[in-house]
A protein has these predicted regions:
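Short, solvent-exposed polar/charged micro-motifs at secondary-structure junctions
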Residues: 15-17, 60-62, 167-177, 228-234
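A short, structural micro-pattern
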Residues: 43, 70, 180-182, 215, ...
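AMP-binding/adenylate-forming catalytic core of the ANL superfamily
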Residues: 80, 85-86, 95-96, 105-106, ...
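Short, internal active-site loops enriched in acidic
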Residues: 55-57, 163-166, 191, 225-229
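Short linear motifs in exposed loops
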Residues: 47, 125-126, 142, 232, ...
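Conserved C-terminal "lid"/linker of ANL adenylate-forming enzymes
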Residues: 158-161, 186, 206-258
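A structural micro-motif
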Residues: 2, 47, 154-155, 216-219
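Conserved AMP-binding/adenylate-forming
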Residues: 1-7, 11-121, 128-131
């Protein structure tokens, strides 16, 4: 059969990695469905990739000592011939996104979090600015959402927080609640034509949540008729808007119950 290659990257750096469809179907998709993140493959020719501790502030200079060990989730940074050196007339954005090296090169901070597996493959776990600091630890969107997306009545899901985490923009900027004080909320867009009642679906989704350690803290499910998305590509969910909607929805429910 035909082999389809998929790439990972960004406007500032593309491609970063490559992965073939056979490997996805044979191996990595199963791990994704179990909450392991999305495998984006191995580095493209000429590209260097590292995973470093998550920081919100600029990193003044590069050191290999920043690199996290295999299997540990952190911020993805890349260096190579396709990496842009700066943002035009945006010195603060450049300072935040670029890590200078001694030889004048730069590492670009992708704004994504992920980890390397034992085979040297990079796994993506979501946007850095969308992580949620919950009572049990840090929740990353892709590993959490993927286990719920396996339900036949779910078109897609989005993990947000009504307390502010998960409502930051893609640069990671914005207000955060104190660590451990964020309340995760699972927003679900149902598959059209599904006949299961909301209450029954909620019970089944919460049963899935309890089946995995990393999702066991999720106890609130809300149903949205159609997620707000970027019209240029339907996959990018505007989580900031969804978090605001979720907060208002919960406030309304609490007022009705009181």
């Amino acid at each position: 059969g035909t082999e389809v290659l998929t790439s990972y990257g960004a406007t500032e750096s593309l491609p970063v990695t490559m992965l073939g469809s056979r490997e996805i179907l044979r191996e990595t998709r199963r791990i994704t469905d179990q909450g392991g993140g999305v495998c984006v493959g191995r580095s493209a020719p000429g590209m260097h990739i590292r995973v470093v501790p998550i920081h919100e502030e600029p990193i003044e200079s590069w050191s290999e000592d920043l690199t996290l060990p295999q299997g540990e989730i952190g911020e993805i940074v890349v260096r190579g011939p396709v990496v842009t050196p700066s943002y035009y007339n945006r010195p603060q954005a450049t300072k935040l996104a670029k890590i200078p090296t001694e030889n004048g090169d730069v590492w670009h901070r992708m704004g994504d979090v992920g980890y390397f597996d034992a085979q040297g493959r990079l796994w993506m776990c979501g946007r850095k600015g969308h992580r949620i600091e919950a009572e049990t630890g840090t929740l990353y969107t892709i590993p959490c959402e993927a286990v719920f997306d396996t339900h036949p009545a779910v078109r897609r899901s989005a993990l947000v927080s009504v307390d502010g985490a998960g409502a930051r923009d893609d640069t990671g900027e914005g207000e955060n609640p104190p660590p451990g004080h964020a309340t995760p909320v699972l927003c679900v867009e149902r598959l059209k034509g599904s006949s299961i009642e909301d209450q029954r679906l909620t019970e089944e989704l919460l049963e899935i949540a309890r089946s995995y350690e990393h999702t066991s803290v999720i106890t609130t499910v809300l149903y949205h008729p159609s997620f707000p998305v970027d019209i240029r590509h339907n996959a990018k969910i505007f989580r900031e808007k969804l978090a605001i909607w979720a907060g208002k929805r919960l406030e309304s429910q609490q007022s009705s119950d009181s």
